[in-house]
Design a protein with these regions (language model features):
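Short Cys/His-rich zinc-binding micro-motifs
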Residues: 431-443
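Long, low-complexity, intrinsically disordered segments
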Residues: 444-457
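Phosphate/dinucleotide-binding and metal-coordinating scaffold of catalytic cores
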Residues: 1-312, 316-430, 455-457
Length: 457
């Protein structure tokens, strides 16, 4: 078990500097008990310094984490989530068997440092034992878009516990630090940029990633910041969604990233609401007014497409020169409204299964705007997303599946929002509601063949 590491950060000014030392204490079974982090004196004197996350203020001396959060969220955000951990554990299990040794008890820090440095999420980097290189070094090149069918097949075999050594090598080489439970990898685009390839899961009941592409395009039309993305059909009813990594700039430089889960310092099984999230984002934002309004627009979108997988890890911020800004939206998926599903409440005492867009309007003050401005935004988002069925068809979704998903879009919340359009002047310039920039390689939007993908990040 690894018990300590030196931590580095790529600063917005382009320098990579030592930031501090991290040590962890774990039980015999590998369960993390506590951790301790201490900033270096040089970092605390650096004019470009910033607190890595709310749990780690810029102070001298050790900062201890224990109890329900035994390691600071910024470190967790740079490591693997459920999908990545499953891959790394499978690789360790296979290595232990091949070497005839007991299975190692891996701590959170072990998982963090096992991630390949090249594809690690955010701007943090690690070294161990005073070594000169960052861990973990990549053994092979990051896969490219031509490897997508092979990645899909390997992920499917892994889900069925039939993966080979070659499968595990490919999937771990493709990166394990992206969050979430769904299969996903890092790939390199033809122009050399890193991108996320979200893969179909073996138990998908509909074309999940085509619907995510649909929702991203609707978000763009509604004026929400989205990453550039393309949809790559694999079979008639499944596809891979490839989107640019927004924690890298156009030159490949790293950009600091924190999840909403880290920002709100959410405890296990605790409930964080959108009013909690917008408050903490505004506290740390370079432009709190703009980010608060953007958050309101995203919540309106969430309610109008019934995106229920909107937990705090599916929100994030990126480091700027003097503070943080909301990242482009990600992991937005419609869900059939045929049964109630718990999701992020609008306010601390709000309903988790029956979120009401009328209540969102009542909460407009928490997002830094008056009710009239909030009504305008809701009406704009409703108009921009009203053509959801046509956009879904553009992405190759079959008519029967469009009908199946209609309850996600044609809801009581949409009826309420649609009534607002009769009294509000709509800004039709948002995101180009008559344009379809995001496309699939084989199914470009009919009127705009050859257009570039959606806006970059």
């Amino acid at each position: 078990m690894t018990s300590e590491a030196d931590v580095f950060v790529d600063l917005p000014d382009g320098r990579t500097v030592p930031v501090g030392h991290l040590s962890v204490r774990a039980s015999e079974a590998g369960m993390l008990v506590s951790s301790q982090f201490q900033y270096t004196a040089d970092y605390l004197r650096d004019p470009a310094r910033y607190s890595l996350c709310p749990e780690l203020p810029l102070v001298q001396g050790p900062i201890t984490a224990t109890g329900h959060r035994p390691i600071a969220g910024c470190f967790s955000d740079s490591g693997p989530d459920r999908w990545g951990r499953n891959l790394l554990f499978a690789a360790e299990r296979r290595a232990a068997k091949a070497q005839g040794r007991p299975l190692a008890h891996m701590t959170d820090l072990d998982f963090i440092i096992m991630v390949h440095d090249e594809t690690r999420q955010g701007a943090l980097r690690y070294s161990i034992d005073g070594g000169p290189e960052f861990v973990s070094p990549a053994r092979d090149q990051v896969p490219s878009l031509v490897d997508l069918p092979e990645l899909v097949a390997a992920a499917r075999r892994h889900a069925q516990h039939r993966e080979t050594d070659t499968d595990l090598d490919l999937l771990t080489r493709a990166g394990t630090s992206m969050g979430g439970a769904r299969p996903k990898t890092t790939v390199r685009t033809p122009d050399g940029r890193l991108a996320i390839a979200k893969l179909p899961a073996a138990d998908d009941q509909w074309n999940v990633l085509a619907w995510e592409a649909t929702t991203l395009e609707l978000a763009r039309r509604a004026g929400v910041a989205v990453p550039a993305f393309t949809l790559h059909p694999i079979t008639p009813d499944s596809a891979v969604l490839v989107s640019d990594r927004f924690d890298r700039d156009a030159n490949g430089a790293r950009i600091g990233y924190l999840s909403g889960h880290t920002l709100v310092e959410k405890i296990p099984d605790g409930i964080a609401s959108y009013t909690d999230l917008v408050e903490v984002v505004a506290d740390h934002s370079e432009d709190p007014d703009a980010d608060s309004r953007e958050m309101f627009r995203r919540v309106a979108l969430t309610l109008l497409v019934n995106n229920v997988d909107d937990h705090m890890k599916n929100h994030g911020v990126l480091r700027g020169s003097t503070g943080w800004r909301l990242s482009p939206v990600f992991d937005v998926n419609p869900f059939p409204a045929r049964w109630p599903v718990d999701s992020t409440p609008l306010s601390h005492d709000g309903d988790t299964a029956g979120r009401d867009i009328g209540q969102l309007l009542d909460l407009s003050g928490h997002f830094g705007m008056d009710r009239a401005s909030a009504v305008t935004i809701v009406a704009e988002v409703e108009r921009a997303t009203a053509s959801w069925a046509d956009v879904a068809a553009d992405f190759g979704i079959e008519p029967g599946e469009v009908e199946f998903m209609s309850s996600a879009f044609e809801s009581e919340n949409r009826s309420i929002a649609r009534n607002l359009t009769t009294t509000v002047r709509i800004d039709t310039s948002l995101g180009g509601a008559d344009r379809c920039q995001a496309r699939t390689p084989t199914r470009p939007c009919p009127a705009h063949q050859g257009m570039p993908t959606g806006p970059g990040t």
